[in-house]
A protein has these predicted regions:
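Hydrophobic alpha-helical transmembrane segments
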Residues: 123-137
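Polar-ligand-bearing catalytic/cofactor-coordination segments
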Residues: 2-103, 144-194
Length: 197
């Protein structure tokens, strides 16, 4: 997957980088006067949680002096800035995600329990096909939500994070930063597509 390739490619330590992702993140939060958001390590997917006011960054990135570390932290801070400014598309995205979680759970349940039961108790290929379509529809809601809200991700990367990074990162590293910001913007969409298959 291209997203993972880019994130790994630029997660190499740069000895000349004056800060880690966490250090730069704290500095940006302070400059943006965002005092109610913390930066925390996590084992899973990098994300900003607007309810908890927490930025979660994978432990293999957070304290590194790498392009991936600083760009991913800046991207997630982009979401914190959106939240601070009450950016309507971010609020809409959160609402949609919460509302579609039920469809994902139904789809998962039907995939694990429903489809095998249908195979066991019916010989009708039509019923099996309808059940498969319903299951795929339920599981695809996540992809649809992230596709619809992709502009929120690109806003966090290129309208919020990129101008900040231009103040701190040497020009010779900006191309790599843009690649990582693009990958960060596409992470949720890529993960949701992979989760279907």
């Amino acid at each position: 997957l291209w997203v993972n390739y880019i994130l790994k490619k630029y997660n190499k330590i740069l000895p000349d980088m004056p800060f880690t992702g966490r250090e730069l993140g704290k500095k940006i939060l302070e400059e943006e006067e965002i005092t109610n958001v913390s930066i925390n390590p996590i084992q899973q997917l990098d994300h900003y949680n607007p309810k908890e006011k927490k930025i979660h960054i994978a432990t293999d990135k957070l304290d590194k002096k790498s392009i991936t570390s600083i760009a991913v932290v800046a991207h997630e801070i982009g979401h914190a800035i959106q939240d601070k400014e009450k950016y309507k598309p971010l609020i809409l995205r959160q609402s949609l995600i919460e509302k579609t979680m039920i469809f994902q759970r139904i789809g998962s349940f039907l995939l694990i329990i429903g489809l095998p039961s249908i195979f066991a108790f019916t010989k009708s290929p039509f019923i099996t096909l309808i059940a498969a379509i319903i299951i795929m529809g339920c599981l695809s809601t996540n992809v649809l939500i992230h596709l619809i809200t992709l502009p929120v991700e690109f806003d966090a990367s290129f309208k919020r994070a990129l101008p900040i990074l231009k103040r701190y990162v040497p020009k010779e590293n900006m191309y790599q930063c843009k690649s990582v910001l693009r990958a960060a913007a596409l992470t949720y969409l890529a993960q949701s597509i992979v989760s279907i298959f």
